[in-house]
Amino acid sequence: MEIKIPDDFKEFPLSDRELGSYKKIKICYDIINHSNEYYKIIIDSTGFSNVENEAVDELYLGLADFRIYENGILKNKQTGNLPYTRGTRKYPFPTNKELLQFKKKNELNFKDIYDIRIFHEISKRIITLAPKETRSFCLDITLPFYNSPADDGATLYFEVENDKRYDYQIHLNIPKQMIHRFSSIIGGSKKYKIFTGEIVSNKVPFILKR
C-alpha cells in the first residue's frame, strides 16, 4: 500500500511549489494498492487529523496526518482553541436519535453514546481497494492554523514561517490493536483483508508565501 502526492501542478514543478499563508490550499494524494489482494482501509476523505504528531485516538482513526519538515526534521504541531477557526466540520454530528438507530442496525451493545459515536464515525471512513486500484483524494488545508472539516475540535498550529523552505508529507497510521474492536462494522471477509500499519507519502518541498 502506498500514499503518493502526484505532480499535478502544471504551472510549476514540485520543487518550486508555493503555498499561500492563511489561504485555503488544496492537497491531493493517491492511495495505491500494489498488491493482488482486495483491501478495506479506514481513511477520512474530508480532512486531516487535528491531533499532534504520533497521536492516534479511536475517534480520529483513519484521519491522515499532514506533517511538515524543516531540513529533514519533523516540525512540532500545537493544539489550541481558537474560536474564529472553529465550526468548519464538513458534515454535522449525528443526533442521538440517529446514533441509536445506528446502534440498533449494527447490533451494538454499548450504553455510552460516545462509544456509539466513535463506531458511527469509523463506519463512514471505510473504503475498498481492489488489486492494483488507485483512489484519489483532495483535501483543503490552511497554514499556519488548521481546523479539520473531519472534526470540530482543537485547532492545530504549525510552527512555520513565510519565505522559508519546508517539506510536507502525508502519514497514515492504522494500529492493528485498534482494529479488532471495530471488526463488526468494518466487515472483514475472505475476499477483503483489513489494512493495518503505517503508510507515508513522498515529501514535497514548498515555500509559504503571504
What are the language-model segments listed below?
Residues 16, 123-129, 155-158, 191-195:
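Beta-strand-rich interaction surfaces with strong enrichment in secreted/lumenal proteins
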Residues 145-180:
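Short, surface-exposed ligand- or partner-binding patches at beta-edge/loop junctions that are enriched
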Residues 128-141, 204:
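Short Pro-Gly-centered flexible turn/kink motifs
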Residues 1-22, 34-42, 206:
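Low-complexity, acidic Ser/Thr/Pro/Gly-rich terminal tails and inter-domain linkers that flank the onset
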Residues 43-134:
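The feature marks short-to-medium sequence segments in extracytoplasmic or secretory-pathway proteins
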Residues 21-28, 200:
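Short, solvent-exposed loop/turn segments enriched in Ser/Thr/Gly
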Residues 29-38, 53:
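Asparagine-centered strand-capping/turn motif at beta-strand->loop junctions
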Residues 172, 177-208:
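Short Trp-Ser/Thr-centered turn/loop motifs at beta-strand boundaries
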